[in-house]
């Protein structure tokens, strides 16, 4: 019975709340933060468990009242109402029972990089950036440009954003991979369609509770920042390169004039990249290999094609095709792709869990 499956979650929630009120925990900030997060993640399922228990009780009481001539009419109404609510509530609960991606509530670093296709790829990085900015705006999320490398022909060779807001990772995690674009460049006189590609990486923003890097494992190099064509060259050593020695991951940052600010930004991205690598290794070790994402989220996996001559956008993971490319891009309507992806993932996970 569903109530039996909900019981451990309710017990765990009550146990965490008890622990949070103990002086021993309140003095340990790191542990308290971790437990508070866990309690918050359990709240939705605990609320639904109460709602479900109330409906089950209502059904049982209404059935008992059916034998009472004075109460039978009212009991029938109550029973009908409760039984109509039950299937929808059960579906909601089944989805909540699925293993939750621990990163779903986190902010993200979104990195878009030009791949094959030269100038056309760089221009599409700019177009995809605008579409993501509109999407973030629709959601009420805050966006900060962390790092950018502009292309001479317009667009970007690479850009990294920090996106903050409610459940950012839970929606944008599906964007990781290769995005292929097919269109006629403005410089193309023969009207030939060119194919180019950009890669998107989605990394959760992490803090010291998620990952702690030993300063001994980090090599920091400082240098003078170089501007395009010798412009805006910083005469002080403000550019920073950080290397995490155990993983070999390197981050370079020169966007800010202050060395300290570049160090802070580089450290943020370094933590996110190391966390992502360790998380991928952990999931691969337990055989999940990024099942939390539809597809691997790997840069090399082609996830989507944007065909401008046909006004078509296709997501290859679920075979979804929409002939509204211009509108989706200009208005940032990514929910039209993300919602079906989430539904697909949930259906697969429910089947796997036997729910």
Curated annotation (Swiss-Prot):
The keyword Cytoplasm applies. One of its GO terms (molecular function) is translation release factor activity, codon specific. Pfam families: PCRF, RF-1. Keywords: Cytoplasm, Methylation, Protein biosynthesis. It is found in: Cytoplasm. PROSITE patterns: RF_PROK_I (PS00745). GO terms for cellular component: cytoplasm. Methylated by PrmC. Methylation increases the termination efficiency of RF1. PANTHER family: LD18447P. Peptide chain release factor 1 directs the termination of translation in response to the peptide chain termination codons UAG and UAA. This is Peptide chain release factor 1. It comes from Nautilia profundicola (strain ATCC BAA-1463 / DSM 18972 / AmH). The lineage of its organism: Bacteria, Pseudomonadati, Campylobacterota, Epsilonproteobacteria, Nautiliales.
């Amino acid at each position: 019975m569903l109530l039996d499956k909900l019981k451990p979650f309710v017990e765990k929630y009550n146990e965490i709340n008890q622990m949070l009120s103990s002086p021993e925990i309140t003095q340990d900030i790191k542990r308290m933060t971790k437990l508070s997060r866990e309690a918050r993640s359990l709240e939705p399922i605990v609320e639904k468990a109460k709602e479900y228990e109330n409906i089950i009780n209502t059904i049982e009481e209404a059935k008992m009242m059916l034998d009472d001539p004075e109460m039978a009419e009212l009991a029938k109404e109550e029973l009908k109402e409760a039984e109509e609510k039950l299937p929808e509530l059960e579906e909601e609960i089944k989805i909540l029972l699925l293993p939750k991606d621990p990163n779903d509530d986190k902010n993200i670093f979104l990195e878009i990089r030009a791949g094959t296709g030269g100038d056309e790829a760089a221009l599409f990085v700019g177009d995809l950036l605008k579409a993501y900015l509109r999407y973030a705006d629709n959601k009420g999320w805050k966006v900060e440009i962390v790092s950018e490398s502009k292309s001479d022909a317009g667009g970007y060779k690479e850009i990294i954003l920090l996106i903050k807001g409610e459940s950012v990772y839970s929606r944008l995690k599906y964007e990781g991979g290769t995005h292929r674009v097919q269109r006629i460049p403005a410089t193309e006189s023969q009207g030939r369609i060119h194919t180019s590609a950009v890669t998107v990486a989605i990394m959760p923003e992490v803090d010291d509770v998620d990952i702690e890097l030993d300063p001994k494992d980090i090599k920091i190099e400082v240098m003078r920042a170089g501007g395009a064509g010798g412009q805006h060259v910083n005469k002080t050593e403000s550019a920073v390169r950080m290397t995490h020695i155990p993983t070999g991951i390197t981050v370079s940052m020169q966007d800010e004039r202050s060395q300290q600010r570049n160090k802070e930004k580089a450290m943020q991205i370094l933590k996110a990249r190391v966390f992502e690598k360790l998380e991928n290794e952990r999931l691969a070790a337990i055989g999940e290999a990024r099942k939390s994402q539809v597809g691997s989220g790997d840069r090399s996996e082609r996830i989507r094609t944007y065909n401008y001559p046909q006004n078509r956008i296709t997501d290859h993971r679920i075979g979804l095709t929409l002939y509204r490319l211009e509108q989706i891009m200009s208005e940032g309507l990514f929910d039209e792709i993300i919602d079906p992806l989430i539904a697909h993932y949930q259906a697969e996970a429910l089947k796997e869990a036997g729910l």
